[in-house]
Amino acid sequence: MKKRSIYYLLTGLLLVCCFLSIGKNLTKKPSFHALVLTERSGIHEGFVVAALDWLKDFSVEQNFEFEVINKTDSISDAYLSHYQVFIQLNYPPYMWTDQSKAAFIQYMEDGRGGWIGFHHASLLGEFDGYPMWDWFSQFMGGIRWKNYIAARATATVHVEDKNHPVMKGLPETFSIPDDEWYTYDKNPRPNVHVIANVDESSYQPPSDIKMGDHPVIWSNDKMKARNIYFQMGHHANIFHSAEFKKMFANAILWAAGKDPVN
């Protein structure tokens, strides 16, 4: 009888501990909030969908929340104050309202959060009737978009700054599959901190569209906000790359002011 009582007591205590643990997890506050500005219904839809699916899993793993928008109308100083990370998921640097431009500039120049940009975020020039956003061009290194590899190509990326937190756990070289590599009217290198470049001789299939020295991952250290741009991000196939997913994960945590995990 005494043994049975002890058994019931221990079982009861175990259940209480389980309920307390579940309750704690249910009420656990997210560690940060991210805003994801997406380009939808275009040639990058597959990449965007794959990225959002990956973000759902990663946000649960790292306990953060994110909101998705596909236009800039709602962006203001007050709106951005709710987000510690701004992810520009292929949304181009045009079709922004004057209010959203001003709010974004303050967000970046005052260091109010961190920024991660992909691919189309460097489509700088006059497109769809919109003028080039000069501030964004300077932010990206004073560049103007020039050309791209229409057929897409797999290529080797070389890490230049292996000590950058976004490169934590990455090899010095790795392959990025099936992407659309951009060229610009000038090299951004003199005006930005280059983190990685692409080896144009490694393009498969080969292409004559080249820059020579070709940065593809960089940061603008003149901004108070932590920021990083990835030129890759055209096709969903990139999410077959463990290295790309590792960089994306590292970038989110770093932009949020946290240490990337191994």
Feature map (PLM): residue ranges:
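Extracellular ligand-binding/catalytic regions of CAZymes and related secreted enzymes
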Residues: 27-32, 38, 60-64, 201-216, ...
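Catalytic beta-strand/loop cores that center a nucleophilic Ser/Cys/Thr
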Residues: 148-224
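A glycine-rich, often tryptophan-bearing local segment used as a flexible ligand/cofactor-contacting loop or short
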Residues: 94-169
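Extracellular/periplasmic catalytic domains that process cell-envelope and extracellular macromolecules
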Residues: 28-30, 60, 78-82, 97, ...
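Proline-centered loop/turn at the N-terminus of a beta-strand
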Residues: 33, 114-116, 193, 226
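Bacterial Sec-dependent N-terminal signal peptides
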Residues: 1-29
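Helical hinge/lid and interdomain linker segments adjacent to catalytic or ligand-binding clefts
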Residues: 35-36, 40-124
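Extracytoplasmic/secreted proteins, especially bacterial periplasmic and envelope-associated proteins
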Residues: 50, 54, 82, 99, ...
